Amino acid sequence: MQPLAEVTLTRPWHWGIAVVGNPVAEVPTDFGGRLVAVGQDVVALSVRHAQDIEADKFEGDWDWATATLHVRSLVQEEVTDRRVLCDTVVATPQETVSLGDADGMVVIPAPSLRTRLIISSDDVDPTGLERVWVDLVAVDG
């Protein structure tokens, strides 16, 4: 099924955390040994830290480590073989979801006023996720 919208974001995450949900919600900080922390209308992900590399300079700047987040806005849930790390519903009254960290946010269309976030990964590393899929699914009612 074709997504309503799809965004892939690959970049260094200098805080080691990616935030998905309401951009003004209080970001959860207690991961309790997990890779995902769920708050009110927001989810925080422990992603590969930008400094998780051998320290090499490239053209006068650091060659930072990156993590990639694939975000899809879907009409209905799709079955996946990836490990599901989180399945929660957030309020999206503006019909948008923000993805980012303190360095910047990207706004993505949400499929409804309440959105189910299904977060999965095919490579779950306890030091931080390197590839993450975030499916946004409309919640009826």
Regions found by a protein language model. Give the residues of each.
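Extended, solvent-exposed segments with strong compositional bias
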Residues: 75-103
